[in-house]
Design a protein with these regions (language model features):
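Conserved radical SAM core fold
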Residues: 6-7, 44-47, 118-119, 150-152
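Active-site acidic/histidine proton-transfer and metal-coordination neighborhood
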Residues: 7-111
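Histidine-acidic metal/acid-base catalytic patches
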Residues: 33-35, 68, 91-209
Length: 209
C-alpha cells in the first residue's frame, strides 16, 4: 500500500493527523494482502523559513521521531514501513537513507528504491548514485519503482521506463543480483504504453523474465 504523507509537516496538528492516517494503513495492510505501507519523507526545505541555518537538522529530527513511531506501529502488525527517498526531500541521498536505517534500527523498516527520484537532474551521476544505493542498503530494499529520465534542454522530466537517459538495463541487472524476484512497480506511464514498455524491459534485461 502507499500512504504518501508528509512526515515532517511543520504544523504539529496536521503532522499528527498524517501519522495517525499512516498508522491506520499499517493496521489494515494485511487485510489487503499488502506486506508494506510506503511513504516519501517531505521537503528538505520544510523548516527553512523558520531557521535558515539549521533547517535540515530540524527536519531530520522531526523525520526520525516520526519514523520511530511508525516503525513501532509496523512491528505491532507485522508489516513493513517503506521509506522512499527523493533528491529534494528529507531523505535526499543514499547516505541519508542509510543514516535513518542506522538511527532507527527496526527490522520492519524497508526501502522503496526509486533511483530516478534520487538522481533528479544529475543524470551524469546516475551510476554512482545507483551503486551507492545498492552498497549502502541493497539488503533493505523491499520494492523498486521504475521510470525514466527525459531531458528537454536544461529541463529533466520523468516518463515511461526504458526510452530515456536512465541506465535501465544496468539497474535491472543489479537489482536481480541484490534482490532477485523483487516486485517492480512502473511509474509515470500511460495506459497505452504499458504493453510496449513491459516488452522493452524484458528485451533489455531477459534475466527479469
Amino acid at each position: 500500500l502507499g500512504c504518501y504523507i508528509n512526515p515532517v509537516h511543520p504544523d504539529p496538528v496536521i503532522r499528527r493527523a498524517e501519522i495517525n492516517r499512516f498508522k491506520e494503513h499499517l493496521r489494515y495492510a494485511r487485510q489487503f494482502g499488502a506486506p508494506m505501507v510506503a511513504t516519501e519523507t517531505g521537503a528538505l526545505t520544510t523548516f527553512q523559513a523558520q531557521d535558515p541555518i539549521h533547517y535540515e537538522a530540524i527536519g531530520w529530527d522531526t523525520l526520525r521521531a516520526t519514523v520511530e513511531e511508525l516503525a513501532e506501529e509496523a512491528e505491532k502488525w507485522g508489516v513493513f514501513l517503506g521509506l522512499e527517498g527523493v533528491c529534494t526531500h528529507t531523505l535526499s541521498t543514499p547516505d541519508k537513507m542509510r543514516r535513518i536505517l542506522d538511527e532507527v534500527p527496526s527490522s520492519c523498516i524497508g526501502v522503496v528504491l526509486d533511483p530516478c527520484n534520487f538522481i533528479g537532474t544529475a543524470a551524469h551521476l546516475q551510476d554512482q548514485i545507483v551503486d551507492d544505493s545498492f552498497r549502502l542498503f541493497g539488503d533493505r530494499i523491499i520494492l523498486a519503482h521504475l521510470k525514466d529520465i527525459y531531458q528537454d534542454g536544461e529541463k529533466a522530466y520523468h516518463g515511461k521506463a526504458g526510452s530515456g537517459v536512465f541506465h535501465t538495463e544496468a539497474f535491472l541487472r543489479k537489482l536481480q543480483v541484490y534482490k532477485p524476484m523483487i516486485d517492480v512497480s512502473l511509474e509515470d506511464i500511460k495506459d497505452l504504453e504499458v504493453n510496449e514498455t513491459v516488452a522493452l524491459l524484458k528485451k533489455l534485461a531477459p534475466i527479469t523474465q
